[in-house]
Design a protein with these regions (language model features):
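Metallo-beta-lactamase
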Residues: 1-120, 149-208, 228-234, 254-273
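Core dinuclear metal-dependent hydrolase active-site scaffold
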Residues: 16-18, 49, 55-60, 66, ...
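Cap/insert and terminal regions of metallo-dependent hydrolase folds
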Residues: 74, 88-109, 217-305
């Protein structure tokens, strides 16, 4: 079976790259669910994974740059008040993740390291609104910020921090938000997905709803005739091989995670050359490099000190 082809024989995408705005250690049960309630393992485990990248995917189009996610803000490791500190919520944040971000690992610096100017970013797609995906927002006041309407609605709930959304780091003045709602589609190249959002109307960048990690999580399919199709998966999985074997991440709504995992796995089975690129998979850079896109990777696995 051939790869999913964009409906128009055009070539709007010139290059795809990945940069890393630091690393994050998380709990092993976060990567792969053991079936134990999340609050239990989060409060009792002493184990951490090794450093995992905080990936930002960079799509160079004929008209400028598009980002998928924006990384982690360095203020999260320099400002003691960045995360909630009191009560159960503060304890959960302290036990959930630990970050390493060097001074040269801002979004602006990472883009410059591969020859790009952040001023050329005209659109940033956010897979969801957790801190390790929204860290570059303050550097992108000139760009359209695209996210699922459901994710945007979560920000207006009474206690979004309980869902991992820190309003004070998201709802910044001067940002150009563009919430979208995937609509029914009949494109056979997107099956089994029945709803999608074509970002520019040319079929090259298509947003797919993959709820579970958060209710409004999105993935993005990059497709162009003659090129390896790419699926930027956010936190739908932390390891492609675990997803292929049907294993779920440890945080999120399990039924929705399971449905999204099945949909992504079905898409992958139909198109074996599909390169799936999660946000924190250490092998994602190598997988992209091995694709027909090649790429320029600036990913730090050993944090600079």
């Amino acid at each position: 079976m051939t790869s999913p082809a964009a409906p128009h024989d055009r070539h709007p995408v010139r290059a795809v790259s990945v940069v890393s705005t630091g690393t994050v250690d998380i709990r092993p049960q976060h990567v792969r669910s053991t079936g134990t309630p999340a609050l239990w393992w989060l409060m009792t485990t002493r184990r951490w994974t090794g450093p995992r990248p905080i990936n930002v995917y960079v799509i160079e189009r004929n008209d400028g740059l598009v980002l998928f996610d924006t990384g982690q803000d360095r203020a999260s490791v320099t400002d003691p008040g960045y995360f909630p500190r009191s009560g159960l919520t503060g304890l959960i944040y302290r036990r959930l993740a630990r970050f390493e971000i060097a001074p040269d690992q801002t979004l602006t610096a990472r883009l410059a390291a591969i020859g790009y100017d952040i001023a050329d970013v005209h659109t940033a797609v956010l897979s969801h609104l957790h801190t390790d995906h929204i860290g570059g927002l303050a550097e992108l006041r000139h760009a359209d910020l695209v996210l699922h309407q459901r994710e945007w609605d979560t920000l207006s709930e009474p206690r979004p921090e309980a869902s991992g959304l820190l309003r004070e780091h998201i709802d910044l003045p001067g940002l150009r938000w563009r919430p979208v709602t995937p609509q029914p589609v009949t494109d056979p190249g997107l099956a089994p997905f029945t709803a999608a959002h074509d970002l520019f109307g040319d079929g090259s960048l298509v947003l797919l709803p993959t709820p579970g990690h958060t209710p409004g999580s999105l993935s993005m399919l990059v497709r162009q005739p003659g090129a390896t199709p790419l699926l930027m998966a956010g936190d739908a999985t932390f390891d492609v091989h675990l997803m292929q074997d049907g294993h779920l991440p440890g945080l999120g709504e399990r039924a929705a995670l399971r449905a999204s995992t099945r949909a992504l796995s079905t898409l992958w089975a139909r198109y074996p050359d599909l390169a799936i690129l999660p946000a924190h998979d250490p092998a994602a850079g190598m997988r992209l490099s091995a694709s027909s896109w090649g790429q320029r990777t600036v990913a730090v696995t050993e944090p600079q000190r």
